[in-house]
Amino acid sequence: MSMASSSSSSLLAMAVLAALFAGAWCVPKVTFTVEKGSNEKHLAVLVKYEGDTMAEVELREHGSDEWVAMTKGEGGVWTFDSEEPLQGPFNFRFLTEKGMKNVFDDVVPEKYTIGATYAPEE
């Protein structure tokens, strides 16, 4: 193998690795802000996802296996009303307008603060 060929292979390998690392670090950020009016039976959350908007958002309470659809309101706020007190921490599953799907577990704690913004651990 010639020196030029070996050097080209090394450069190509480094370029591929750089692209892989860049892709891993460029995952869009998602945040969940608990909105005013949330209480033990009503949860209102503003979901922000960099570069995209939510098409569907589902909620799963702590200890439950059931995902329930949230209702989209004004300004990107998603709400859920329950007859029983809601049990956190809360898990979210969503589909964006661009087709990205994701699940985030235990994002909003049981004892959340109105106006606080929560982000999944990376």
Swiss-Prot record:
Residues 41-120 form the Expansin-like CBD domain. Keywords: Allergen, Secreted, Signal. The keyword Signal applies. The keyword Signal applies. Its main location: secreted. Disulfide bonds: none annotated. GO terms for cellular component: extracellular region. GO terms for biological process: plant-type cell wall loosening. Pollen specific. It holds the Pfam family Expansin_C. Residues 1-26 form the signal peptide. It is found in: Secreted. Belongs to the expansin family. Expansin B subfamily. This is Pollen allergen Phl p 2.
